[in-house]
């Protein structure tokens, strides 16, 4: 199954970049994976609703023909690592060829994104930067793969 991750904002922090590269290296034997970054739509001191709307329009345009989209959102469903592994396995077993995850910018997602009929998951009740959310997601994707394959990584 192909995985795609869309996020608002570039990853600039060195240790996170290194972690992202490491997890991509570990995931790639099992999945083709692509990460796409959209630029921020403005500074957070500008009109927040306009920024969220503009960023939301980018997602909707890029994903207009996609059905298998997972929005990472603070009010999404929380899953344990074992439950997330099952979630991924169900997508794989259903014949899904591509699963897309989206990570919002500092202001989150606009209502036009949240109103889509897309699955919403939360990485935690805590809030993360887009960089940290990407790293946590990649770690959980790798962990899910090791769980589903019976590999020693998850205890």
From Swiss-Prot:
<feature type="binding site">
    <location>
        <position position="104"/>
    </location>
    <ligand>
        <name>S-adenosyl-L-methionine</name>
    </ligand>
</feature>
<dbReference type="GO" id="GO:0005737">
    <property type="term" value="C:cytoplasm"/>
</dbReference>
<keyword id="KW-0963">Cytoplasm</keyword>
<dbReference type="GO" id="GO:0070038">
    <property type="term" value="F:rRNA (pseudouridine-N3-)-methyltransferase activity"/>
</dbReference>
<protein>
    <recommendedName>
        <fullName>Ribosomal RNA large subunit methyltransferase H</fullName>
        <ecNumber>2.1.1.177</ecNumber>
    </recommendedName>
</protein>
<comment type="function">
    <text>Specifically methylates the pseudouridine at position 1915 (m3Psi1915) in 23S rRNA.</text>
</comment>
<keyword id="KW-0489">Methyltransferase</keyword>
<dbReference type="InterPro" id="IPR029026">
    <property type="entry name" value="tRNA_m1G_MTases_N"/>
</dbReference>
<keyword id="KW-0949">S-adenosyl-L-methionine</keyword>
<dbReference type="InterPro" id="IPR003742">
    <property type="entry name" value="RlmH-like"/>
</dbReference>
<feature type="binding site">
    <location>
        <position position="72"/>
    </location>
    <ligand>
        <name>S-adenosyl-L-methionine</name>
    </ligand>
</feature>
<comment type="similarity">
    <text>Belongs to the RNA methyltransferase RlmH family.</text>
</comment>
<feature type="binding site">
    <location>
        <begin position="123"/>
        <end position="128"/>
    </location>
    <ligand>
        <name>S-adenosyl-L-methionine</name>
    </ligand>
</feature>
<dbReference type="InterPro" id="IPR029028">
    <property type="entry name" value="Alpha/beta_knot_MTases"/>
</dbReference>
<comment type="subunit">
    <text>Homodimer.</text>
</comment>
<keyword id="KW-0808">Transferase</keyword>
<keyword id="KW-0698">rRNA processing</keyword>
<dbReference type="Pfam" id="PF02590">
    <property type="entry name" value="SPOUT_MTase"/>
</dbReference>
């Amino acid at each position: 199954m192909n995985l795609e991750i869309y996020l608002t904002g570039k990853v600039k922090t060195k240790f996170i970049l290194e972690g992202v590269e490491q997890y991509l290296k570990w995931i790639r034997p099992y999945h083709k994976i692509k990460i796409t970054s959209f630029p921020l739509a403005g500074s957070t001191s500008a009109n927040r609703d306009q920024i969220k709307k503009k960023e939301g329009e980018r997602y909707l345009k890029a994903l207009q023909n996609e059905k298998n989209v997972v929005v990472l959102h603070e009010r999404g469903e929380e899953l344990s690592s074992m439950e997330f592994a099952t979630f991924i396995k169900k997508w794989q077993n259903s014949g899904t060829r591509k699963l897309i995850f989206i990570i919002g910018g500092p202001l989150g997602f606009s209502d036009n994104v949240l109103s889509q009929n897309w699955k919403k998951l939360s990485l935690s009740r805590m809030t993360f930067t887009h960089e940290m959310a990407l790293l946590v997601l990649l770690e959980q994707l790798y962990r899910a793969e090791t769980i589903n394959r019976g590999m020693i990584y998850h205890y």
